[in-house]
Amino acid sequence: MRHYEIVFMVHPDQSEQVPGMIERYSAAITGAEGKIHRLEDWGRRQLAYPINKLHKAHYVLMNVEAPQEVIDELETTFRFNDAVIRSMIMRTKHAVTEASPMVKAKDERRERRDDFANETADDAEAGDSEE
C-alpha cells in the first residue's frame, strides 16, 4: 500500500457535518485494511482567494496508507459531494506522523496563553496574601 496526503475543504455552512465526513472517510480507509497516520481538523480558515464567492472554508488534513481502490473511491466521493469545495490527494514516499506546522503553531500559542494565565493567577494570589 502507498502513503497519501489528503486535504479537503468543506463549505463553511456545512462545518457541522465535518466530524461525520471524517468518520465515514476514516471507516472507508480502515475497512480496506488501510491506516490513518495523521488526522488534523484545522477548522474554519480564511481562503487565499475566493472560491465560488466564499472567503472561508473548513480544512481537514489526513495522512493515510491505503490501497488505490480506496483512494479512487474517496476522490469520487469528494467530486460528487457538494459540501467539499476543493480536495487534493497527493502520494507521499513515507508515512507522515508528526504534527503539521499549523498545529504546532496552534499548540505553542495555547501553551503561551496557559502560561500567561497561570502567571496572572499566581500574581493575583500573591496580591491577595499581602493584604
From Swiss-Prot:
Q: Name one GO molecular function term.
A: small ribosomal subunit rRNA binding
Q: Where is this region: Disordered?
A: 96-131
Does this UniProt record's set of keywords contain Ribonucleoprotein?
Answer: yes
Which terms are listed as keywords in the entry?
A: Ribonucleoprotein, Ribosomal protein, RNA-binding, rRNA-binding
Tell me the function of this protein: Binds together with bS18 to 16S ribosomal RNA.
Name this protein carries in UniProt: Small ribosomal subunit protein bS6
Q: Has UniProt tagged this entry with the keyword Iron?
A: no
Q: Which InterPro entries match?
A: Ribosomal_bS6, Ribosomal_bS6_CS, Ribosomal_bS6_sf, Ribosomal_S6_plastid/chlpt, Transl_elong_EF1B/ribsomal_bS6
Q: What is the superkingdom listed in this entry's lineage?
A: Bacteria
Q: Which family does it belong to?
A: Belongs to the bacterial ribosomal protein bS6 family.
Q: Where is the composition biased (Acidic residues)?
A: 120-131
> Which GO terms are recorded in the biological process aspect for this UniProt protein?
translation
Any single GO CC term annotated in Swiss-Prot or TrEMBL for this entry: cytosolic small ribosomal subunit
Coiled-coil intervals, chain numbering: none
What HAMAP family does the record tag this protein with?
Ribosomal_bS6 (MF_00360)
**What gene is behind this protein?**
rpsF
- Residue stretches of biased makeup (Basic and acidic residues): 104-116
